[in-house]
């Protein structure tokens, strides 16, 4: 199976929920938002979430795994990524976003952490 992202829920009022599968060693993200916020919940595998404030440079990291379910908040103005730290297992992450993607007003800006 290739890396994948599948939208599970899509509502104009409450945003969207998707499931994301990352192969071993893969980094995803490397972007930030003006108004969107997201929650990343790793349900299987072992990964690292990195966030960096685009104005101050302050950086935070969260080691995450399916063995310890927790929600990590991606806040506006912080570029973020998620890295699969495993050499053998997929990283499975439930991702929620408070807004749906609007192609006429995109709110995703590439910037490495």
Label every PLM stretch briefly.
Residues 1-16, 27:
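A short, N-terminal "cap"/entry segment at the start of jelly-roll beta-barrel domains
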Residues 18-36:
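Conserved short histidine dyad/triad with adjacent acidic residue
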Residues 29-31, 49-51, 71-74, 80-87:
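Short beta-strand His + acidic residue motifs that chelate non-heme Fe in jelly-roll/DSBH
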Residues 35-36, 68, 78-79:
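A generic "binding-loop/recognition-motif" signal
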Residues 35-53:
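Glycine- and acidic-residue-biased ligand/ion/polar-headgroup-sensing regions
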Residues 53-76:
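Short acidic-glycine-tyrosine-enriched beta hairpin
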Residues 56-58, 62, 79, 83-113:
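Double-stranded beta-helix
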């Amino acid at each position: 199976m290739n890396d994948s992202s599948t939208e599970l829920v899509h509502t104009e009022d409450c945003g969207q929920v998707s499931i994301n599968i990352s192969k071993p060693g893969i980094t995803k993200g490397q972007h930030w938002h003006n108004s969107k916020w997201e929650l990343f919940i790793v349900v299987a595998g072992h990964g690292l979430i990195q966030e960096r404030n685009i104005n101050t440079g302050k950086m935070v990291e969260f080691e995450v795994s399916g063995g310890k379910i927790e929600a990590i908040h991606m806040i506006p103005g912080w570029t973020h990524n998620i890295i699969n730290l495993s050499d053998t297992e997929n990283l499975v992450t439930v991702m929620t976003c408070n807004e749906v993607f609007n192609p006429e007003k995109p709110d995703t800006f590439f910037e490495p952490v």
